[in-house]
Amino acid sequence: MNNEFAFPRIIEKFSVAGELISCERYGEGHINDTFKVTMDDCGREVHYILQRINNRLFPDVDRLMHNIELVTEFCRKSVIERGGAPMRECLTLIRTKDGASYTCEDGNYFRMYVFIEGATTYQSVRDPRDFYESAVAFGKFANLLAKFDASQLYEVLPDFHNTRVRYENFLRAVEKDICGRAEEVRSEIDWVKSRSDLCGKIVDKIASGEIPLRVTHNDTKLNNVMLDDATGKGLAVIDLDTVMPGSLCYDFGDSIRFGCNSAAEDEPDTEKVHFLFDLYKTYLDGYLSAVGNSVTQEEKENLPTGAVLMTYECGMRFLTDYLEGDVYFRTHRARHNLERARTQFKLVDEMLACFSQMPAAVK
């Protein structure tokens, strides 16, 4: 039994039956502390996920859990309406005995979910089929929530994908140059400025109503999709801490940014970095097959723009952090954030080089 926290006392607060057998660290997440709980319920082992919420990153736990409660309940009802299996196809919160969605113990905040049996998350793509199935899962997630009023959600990370605001932050970092690094990255600074027209591509369309406000996941990587152990199919989307109002183009674009790179996100040698157009088409096919008619034509036409925009924005954030002294993203070596930024910028250049083909794949 892991003894990091008073697990018996914490678990006792939740509405779970049986006696506690074990509570051990689980998974490879970096934001929250995740544990697999095993209970003995009349001789039958039952599993749950217990998480200690990172309230340094998410200080307003009430708002965080408000979002998760609304989204998981809406997903559950949507799955039931379609004759699905809600305990396997979406996250299910376990309430505390007093009806709350989380509990606090010694200044630490905990929540509990039903453990989804017979499914696994993967840190990297084993073959293109995995990427396709992650696209299906995120497309289905968007489809399940298509009728949800996204204005009900709080922005737990304000202006997270407001690229105009990100650009303003970047310009301030360049002007202040608190670490004296601006001169060495002058070419990268000029590169970002020369493509600043990208900043308003999506956010302005949301403001004008051309693109609808949707529930967005905001961390659409493969490791946030549970794949069925038996079939390999995308089963459920997890890690809902960053669900907020936004555009489907953001979620689609972030998946492409992360998954269609021939190299690691922090590859120092940009000669190894290439945009994998075939994987882009694979993901697009899976996503559109699952999102169905819930996506508008305007959204469809802007999916390629979302891919370019999210990659540009991410690279700009890495460069901003480098200029500010590496205070946001965890680094493991000198110039780590600069290497990350250059990787993203190389991807943007390659995306733009074949951009005329990207919208055609949507048709």
Enumerate the language-model features and the residues they cover.
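Juxta-kinase regulatory segment immediately upstream of eukaryotic protein kinase catalytic domains
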Residues: 1-24
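Amphipathic alpha-helical segments that form well-ordered structural scaffolds
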Residues: 9-10, 140, 191-198, 282, ...
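Conserved ATP-binding subdomain of kinase catalytic cores across diverse folds
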Residues: 22-40, 45-172, 246-248, 259-260, ...
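ATP-dependent phospho-/nucleotidyl transfer catalytic cores
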Residues: 24-28, 51-62, 119-132, 147-217, ...
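Active-site Asp-x-Gly
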Residues: 59, 227-295, 328-337
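Helix-rich C-terminal or lid/interface subdomains of diverse kinases
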Residues: 165, 281-359
